[in-house]
Amino acid sequence: MKKEFSRVLLKNQSDEILILKDRPDTWNFPGGKQELGESALECAIREMKEELAVEITELEEIFTGPLVFDSIVWQGHFYFAKQAQGKVTLNEPNKIKGVQFIMRFEEVNFSPGLAPLFDYLARSDYLKLNKTNWK
């Protein structure tokens, strides 16, 4: 069975990007593993609601590709949420140790496995040109 996950990038009103701490020494974007029979898009929507009580709509897939974590190849799907509703709330404190908004990715430590995503984002103006509208 193919290992797949979905992650979501979204911004607050100050153009900062939401990240969470789900590993002891690295930060990540909200999301998680796909469940059986679930699409990558459905996974992204479900994980945001489960983890952080935020409902997202108008998602655009901005990056997809194989990523390697601990010698395991995963198919990663990264979405940008153009619409969000709710207050960011830590729903799974046993799994997620922190949440914050950042201006630059260099501010925190991400997994080296995300390098292909960051390479893409460095070459793209996508995050500069798009915003998340909060209700």
Question: Whereabouts are the PLM-identified features?
Answer:
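Conserved N-terminal beta-strand and adjoining loop/helix that marks the start
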Residues: 1-17
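Conserved hydrophobic "DFG−1" position in protein kinase catalytic cores
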Residues: 10-11, 19, 81, 101
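Conserved Nudix-box catalytic region and its N-terminal flanking loop in Nudix hydrolases
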Residues: 12-50
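Short helix-loop capping/hinge motifs at secondary-structure junctions, enriched
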Residues: 16-17, 85-89
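NUDIX/MutT-family hydrolases
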Residues: 80, 90-123
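Acidic/histidine-enriched, glycine/proline-rich intrinsically disordered or flexible terminal extensions
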Residues: 125-135
